[in-house]
């Protein structure tokens, strides 16, 4: 069994990335064998890419000529990568308010969020989301989700079930991850990353605090599902008031206006 498991691990790590259904079949077999499994950054990115592709297919992606895409392109000009992760940006045309960044570098922004925020505020939120990826906060969450999916295969490690792993399944996996909460420590780190991100973009980093103020006002609108996903992701501690206070203190200390 050890030799077989070692062979499977070697195959998983050394070959070109197979179709994602094959990856899940292999992971399922290893999980059933009780083996500890880790994924390389490249393997994880390939699996996440499949999930993001399914979400892109499920959602309405704004065309390259749309005002939303052009605005995002203008704001993110020159933002090609961070910490070795290459970005690709798209806008979803939707009434929901959200944005997310994934370990493969995919960054997706919802049009309603763009409607709600100024350029600087939007960059702050993007910086926060990119921070979770650049600081590797998202990596373990996605890896754990993939391994849970593999372990849940009840029909055998090489059954046709994984070969038929559907686009809707990939999409559901992705959606569960983009709304996942992070720890208090990770949220503070991502806030600080967003703050520094704004400074590097030549913007007033207090826009990070202003974005939090708007998110707080959204959270006070009872009965609305429009902001549900974004607010759920941002609702873990620290709370909005603390985040706003921290951003204000940092901005004032750095000599920026906080109006």
Task: Please tell me what each predicted stretch does.
Residues 4-13:
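Sec-dependent N-terminal signal peptides
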Residues 15-19:
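Sec/Tat signal peptide C-region and signal peptidase I cleavage site
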Residues 20-259:
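A Zn2+-metalloprotease active-site environment signal
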């Amino acid at each position: 069994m050890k030799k077989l498991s070692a062979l499977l691990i070697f195959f998983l790590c050394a070959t070109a990335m197979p179709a994602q259904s094959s990856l899940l079949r292999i992971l399922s077999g290893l999980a059933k064998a009780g083996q500890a499994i880790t994924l390389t950054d490249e393997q994880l990115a390939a699996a996440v890419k499949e999930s993001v592709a399914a979400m892109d297919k499920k959602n309405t992606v704004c065309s390259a000529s749309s005002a939303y895409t052009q605005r995002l392109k203008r704001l993110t000009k020159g933002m090609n990568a961070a910490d070795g992760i290459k970005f690709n940006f798209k806008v979803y045309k939707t009434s929901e308010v959200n944005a997310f960044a994934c370990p493969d570098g995919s960054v997706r922004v919802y049009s309603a969020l763009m409607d709600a925020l100024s350029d600087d505020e939007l960059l702050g939120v993007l910086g926060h989301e990119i921070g979770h990826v650049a600081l590797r906060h998202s990596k373990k969450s996605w890896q754990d989700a993939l391994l849970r999916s593999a372990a849940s295969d009840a029909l055998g490690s090489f059954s046709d079930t994984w070969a038929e792993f559907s686009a809707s399944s990939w999409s559901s996996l992705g959606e569960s991850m983009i709304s996942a909460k992070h720890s208090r420590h990770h949220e503070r780190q991502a806030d600080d990353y967003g703050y520094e991100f704004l400074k590097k973009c030549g913007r007033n980093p207090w826009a990070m605090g202003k974005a939090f103020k708007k998110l707080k006002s959204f959270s006070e609108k009872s009965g609305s599902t429009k902001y549900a996903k974004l607010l759920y992701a941002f609702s873990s501690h620290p709370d909005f008031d603390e985040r706003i206070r921290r951003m204000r203190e940092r901005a004032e200390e750095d000599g920026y206006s906080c109006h």
